[in-house]
Amino acid sequence: MLKPPLPLRSLLFLQLPLLGVGLNPKFLTPSGNEDIGGKPGTGGDFFLTSTPAGTLDVSTLPLPKVQCFVFNVEYMNCTWNSSSEPQPNNLTLHYGYRNFNGDDKLQECGHYLFSEGITSGCWFGKKEIRLYETFVVQLQDPREHRKQPKQMLKLQDLVIPWAPENLTLRNLSEFQLELSWSNRYLDHCLEHLVQYRSDRDRSWTEQSVDHRHSFSLPSVDAQKLYTFRVRSRYNPLCGSAQHWSDWSYPIHWGSNTSKENIENPENPSLFALEAVLIPLGSMGLIVSLICVYCWLERTMPRIPTLKNLEDLVTEYQGNFSAWSGVSKGLAESLQPDYSERLCHVSEIPPKGGEGPGGSPCSQHSPYWAPPCYTLKPEP
């Protein structure tokens, strides 16, 4: 059988999707006996071999780009594989600095960073950082013998400083505050952004500060609680960095604050101590009051009301102790434990010659008066 001409074969190949052969999840791979030139007798037909979607060969993926950041000019991290795509094997990073002749002498990274057992970055110490020289990096796949095109980076544009520290507030006048802070890098190479708001504001107010490490707020209200925070960036005098540092710890001033709170804006240990002691003290006071109330209920008799006086006669038959609620032991302790003897005294008319000072117990008549007795408690 003669083969159809080459244009006709191409037309048939383009019509395969119309015949129900799906080419989207398939790749055309040569079988090893194909004839690109169309010579007869060499088996120039292609076989369709399918590869399931989602199981792409990582060797066909492009190498990821390298992203570098210099942290406070103390160390540098260059990372890759920031996307969710699978990484082709363990990649190696080669770096160097471009000289005046344009000759890039690259060397391999000495301190790799790993993620799930696969290289994901390279760490550089302070001595390896040349801030104002062109930094050259190249990512390579040693197994597939592939290389990424060289990347040229300006490290002065990739500096991220540390967050400002030691925020301090002081009063310049009755209604004016000054906020100051410090950085762990040269102040003339940093610009700052100050944010502040009161407890009655919903949004932050921003103020840019260049080359200085202080900020003045001319008008404040002592009845409000103010919050301040600062962040820094490498300024255009030393570089063109676009990344800000992290925000500093906030500092507060205003109502419900004191001088100690301004100097030490946050004291977690004191806050935790107050949060524990105040509830415990309140609960202890409540329990003590309940105990005192119960003790008084048991020891103090109830005071009867006037409307219950009828019960003293009708229900208790005049028994005051039972009606008043006095305990039996208390009633017995109130009764006397002695008896009185009567002393019979009789008056004898005085005789003549007797003065008024005669004793009433003197015997001036033939009748004897009963003896007099004094009150003595019974033994």
UniProtKB/Swiss-Prot annotation:
Membrane-spanning residues:
270-290
Positions where Phosphothreonine occurs in the chain = 305
Q: Which cysteine-cysteine pairs are annotated as disulfide bonds in the entry?
A: 68-78, 109-122
So which residues have sugars stuck on them? 77, 81, 90, 166, 171
Motif Box 1 motif residues? 299-307
One GO MF term on file is: cytokine binding
Topology, Cytoplasmic side: 291-379
One GO term describing the cellular component: cell surface
- GO biological process: one example: interleukin-15-mediated signaling pathway
Q: Where is this motif: WSXWS motif?
A: 244-248
Q: Which PROSITE patterns match?
A: FN3 (PS50853), HEMATOPO_REC_S_F1 (PS01355)
Domain named Fibronectin type-III: residues: 163-260
Record's signal peptide: 1-22
Function of the protein: Common subunit for the receptors for a variety of interleukins. Probably in association with IL15RA, involved in the stimulation of neutrophil phagocytosis by IL15.
Output the PANTHER family linked to this UniProt entry.
CYTOKINE RECEPTOR, INTERLEUKIN 2 RECEPTOR SUBUNIT GAMMA
What family name appears in the similarity comment? Answer: Belongs to the type I cytokine receptor family. Type 5 subfamily.
User: What is the designated name of this protein?
Assistant: Cytokine receptor common subunit gamma
Please tell me the species this chain comes from.
Bos taurus
Q: Which gene encodes it?
A: IL2RG
